Amino acid sequence: MEKVLFFGDPGIDDSFAIMFGLLHPEIEIVGIVTGYGNVEHIHAAHNAAYILQLANRQDIPVISGATKPLTEEITTYYPEIHGPEGLGPIHVPESVLSIPIYNFGSIASILVKYGKDLTIVDVGRSTSLAIAFNLWNDLMLNVKGIYFMGGVFLEVGNVTPLAEANVYGDPIASKIVFQQANNLFIYPLNVTNKAVLTPNMFDYIQANSKNPFHTIMKPMYDYYFSAYQKLNPSIEGPLLHDVVAISGLVNPSFFEFVNRTVNVDTYGDTKGQTFADFRPSSISEGACIALEIDEEKFIQDFIKTML
């Protein structure tokens, strides 16, 4: 059983990643750290709390993370992709607002409690993770591994021609994580752009699912797919970017990896660009970067888990 401290900014695809983690028999989520990103930090916290409420897992703490990037730039949110509060057309019920949100220092107790048995999955801006490295460096270096969704290598970005949204949102934080993390696994757009959930696949899940999220999945999916169609009318379905990283934790055989030292541009026209040396003579060291995915096996496992 993989014990996971989840960092994210839910967000529709973050929410599907949390659902996947709660339902997967090999994953135990022990805490969720929410911050700004797809939506404002307070909506992200309430969305995570709502998902936990639906799952009857209020024993899992929701921890308040970063409210703005280390770059101190004005944050751009994405209501056209994720909805005004982050769950598409869904508004969390009033009962969620009374669920306690824990302070950032609660991360330290989780790091101490689980130590080398803890894996961190980060699928949002890396601000909270970078702050955790600055506050509790020894404890952070002691975790089993860090699984990060973000970046892109040798392909185009999704928020600029060069940059992926999570890294672009706080490249200084991403740089801190890339430089300090031990046993870092990166799942960039190279693989997440292939994690397409078509309407037929989703309809099968919806028709056969008995999971506690059944009532909210369809409006979330429909909103998300509609947003993607406006950006790319030929797309076959929305992309499960964030699910890829947490799936990779328990399904490493679905991916092909290379090891490279990763860097990121932090300002200027190339802000948020991730890069590494992929020349034939380059040294195989540093982060483990997923560059290929068996999308059929990934989707089959996602469907099986969500039923």
Give names to the regions the model predicted.
Residues 2-50, 91-194, 199:
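Active-site histidine-anchored catalytic micro-motif
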Residues 14, 82-84, 128, 241:
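Histidine-centered active-site/metal-ligand motif
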Residues 45-49, 53-113, 286-292, 307:
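Metal-dependent C-N hydrolase catalytic cores
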Residues 5, 29, 56-60, 216:
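Generic alpha-helical hydrophobic packing signal
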Residues 1-9, 62-68, 86-89, 128-134, ...:
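Short, mixed-charge, low-aromatic patches
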Residues 76-83, 160-164, 202-203, 279-281:
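Short, surface-exposed amphipathic charged segments that create phosphate/polyanion-binding patches used
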Residues 62, 177, 246:
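A residue-level signal for conserved active-site and pocket-lining positions in enzyme catalytic cores
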Residues 1, 20-21, 26-29, 168, ...:
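Conformational coupling and interaction surfaces
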